[in-house]
Amino acid sequence: MGDLELLLPGEAAVLVRGLRSFPLREIGSGGWNQQHENLEKLNMQAILDATASQGEPIQELLVTHGKIPTLVEELIAVEMWKQKVFPVLCRLEDFKPQNTFPIYMVVHHEASIINLLETVFFHKEVCESAEDAVLDLIDYCHRKLTLLVARSSRGGPPAEEECQSSTPMQLEHHVAPQELQKQAELMEFEIASKALSVLRYITDCVDSLSLSTLNRMLSTHNLPCLLVELLEHNPWSRREEGKLQQFEGGRWQTVAPSEQQKLSKLDGQVWIALYNLLLSHEARARYCLTSFAKGQLLKIPEIWERLERENRGKWQAIAKYQLRHVFSPSEQDLRLQARRWAETYRLDVLEAIAPERPRCAYCSAEASKRCSRCQNEWYCCRECQVKHWEKHGKACVLAAQGDRAK
């Protein structure tokens, strides 16, 4: 593990320096896709660094080059695209893409960024380098956790098969737009769990946060009350056939009876955040603010409001532009993209950062055999592979063609 590297230090520095914000109209474009690939590489390298305990150059590079605010703006931009543009795009009469792979990349982008932020925000200097963007990040986390509470009160957590996150190379060749919308909604559950971790890391810095940041957490959003709601609804726990299951590592796992009295990782994040917000000296001293002070501190411009103001009334125009120029790629473009993703998602790296053993693509049992053709899907036995071929076949052919194109 310690010797495994996806990026050399010089390569990582170049990728970090090149990070920039994109207008909503350019989301899904060639330049945007290139940055998405770069973010995935940085993401995987950051996880490798943290796992190997070798120091974390990705985190240091992001701080040195002042790119944390850029990541926050990109995070909120794609969140807005999913809320404002994506539904309009799916309703267009001529929206009949031959391949939904490019759209999935955009839907997956939010999860990629929040995962990278979760990895690096463990370090206090990252929170400090976010500057004013930390306010927007707090707003973002508040939105995600509010939706998580609302979802758990409506009908509980998503099912096992709904929570499985896929790499782009595991995505089907063609998925109906309605199915893509469903996948985007289901992905919100894991995104919210990452947002909780990021918020907890921000509260770790409560003694050094600005007055406006504390005010945003304690007065504007009243985060202590929201965190108590999370503990009450406990959306990351459920009972299936009488057995307690908890959501950890991107999947539902059965908890042994001897382990059921222990706090889950997500429960622990909530309790630590509550401790930081309610018992730290700085938070207690600053909880009560005058109306005048609140009004002054809330005048800080926010990324969400600026992006919405810049694009208000343009959602349909953006959707139509992206339908013509972004989400209708040629077969050659798709094969090129498949080849580039095969290079990005190196199998040795994915196996190194995987939280547990691979699972069978058909029955979800622990798997030891990989598809010999594309090397992307795992199976527990030959019978499961045969049964899954009808669903996996097209994606397998596309991936194999991408490998041969190298």
Report each predicted region and the residues it spans:
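Cys/His-coordinated zinc-finger cores
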Residues: R370-V397
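Short cysteine-rich clusters marking metal-coordination/redox-active sites
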Residues: C360-C363, C371
